[in-house]
């Protein structure tokens, strides 16, 4: 009898461990701020946990590499949500055998050649296709829908919650788009010089024109020729301000400001920080204040 009790206890222990393992919260990793925020919002009210891989203050991932902690978090995740459109190309080896939700599916991408033709972008270090899709709220809606569909396919027991959360998220993105249109509709100047080549989707979303996008390499500074060209553009277009990126250098912009009297303002790529929405509202308000 005592032997049977021991056997039953052991069997129950294994069963309980199995149940605990089966019922453990799903682990998801998301690469950057926008997809992490959208995924976290969609998973609210479920036991699904979402880890953000890239938390440092960054404005591009050209030369980025994950540290040991980030690699372990990615390997521990059942699913990895990526922004897509080539942004995470540096993760190809890590993602090769992973379950991926690509948030960029179905979004029309701006190509480098198109950017240079339409917005007169400087030739330089940019992706063949511009991956900064989240800077247009309408694209962010598509990203959110893609993530929701991917989550529902993997965790159908929470599909209704995902859909409910998606509805609220889409409403907030609609409000963001409308706020940007209303705030920027009567600008005295609609032309920008930016010290990052990733604001094309934002410009298109709010009917702005990027006269020049300068992508300064890490550790390098604009040449005298570049500065002369930029100063000329500021003067010819009567630009009241030029726009740096929060994580980038402002040295060239400050020189241009001294020579022309234009202001220097900072825009946010919304790749890091604490809130996609805060970054987007900051960009809208900053442009309104700078360009009137």
Feature locations, PLM:
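N-terminal secretory signal peptides that target proteins for export/translocation
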Residues: 1-2
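Bacterial N-terminal signal peptides
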Residues: 7-17
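Extracytoplasmic metal-acquisition and chelation regions
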Residues: 19-292
């Amino acid at each position: 009898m005592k032997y049977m009790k021991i056997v039953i206890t052991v069997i129950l222990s294994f069963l309980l461990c199995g149940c605990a393992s089966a019922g453990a919260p799903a682990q998801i990793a998301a690469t950057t701020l926008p997809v992490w925020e959208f995924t976290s919002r969609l998973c609210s009210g479920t036991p699904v946990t979402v880890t953000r891989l890239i938390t440092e203050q960054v404005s591009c991932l050209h030369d980025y590499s994950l540290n040991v902690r980030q690699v372990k978090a990615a390997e521990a995740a059942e699913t990895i949500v990526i922004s897509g459109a080539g942004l995470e190309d540096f993760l190809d080896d890590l993602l090769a055998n992973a379950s991926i939700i690509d948030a960029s599916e179905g979004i029309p991408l701006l190509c480098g050649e198109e950017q240079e033709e339409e917005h007169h972008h400087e030739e330089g270090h940019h992706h063949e296709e511009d991956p900064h899709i989240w800077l247009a709220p309408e694209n962010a809606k598509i990203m959110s829908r893609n993530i929701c569909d991917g989550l529902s396919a993997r965790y159908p027991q929470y599909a209704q919650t995902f859909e409910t959360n998606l509805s609220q998220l889409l409403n907030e993105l609609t409000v963001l788009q409308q706020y940007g249109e209303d705030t920027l509709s009567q600008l005295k100047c609609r032309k920008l010089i930016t010290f990052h080549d990733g604001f094309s989707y934002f410009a298109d979303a709010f009917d702005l024109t990027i006269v020049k996008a300068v992508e300064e390499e890490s550790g390098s500074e604009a040449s005298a020729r570049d500065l002369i060209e930029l100063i000329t553009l500021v003067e010819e277009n009567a630009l009241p301000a030029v726009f740096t990126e929060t994580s980038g250098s402002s040295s060239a912009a400050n020189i241009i400001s001294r020579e022309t009297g234009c202001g220097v303002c900072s825009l946010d790529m919304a790749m890091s920080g604490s809130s996609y929405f805060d970054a987007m509202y900051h960009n809208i308000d900053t442009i309104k204040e700078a360009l009137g």
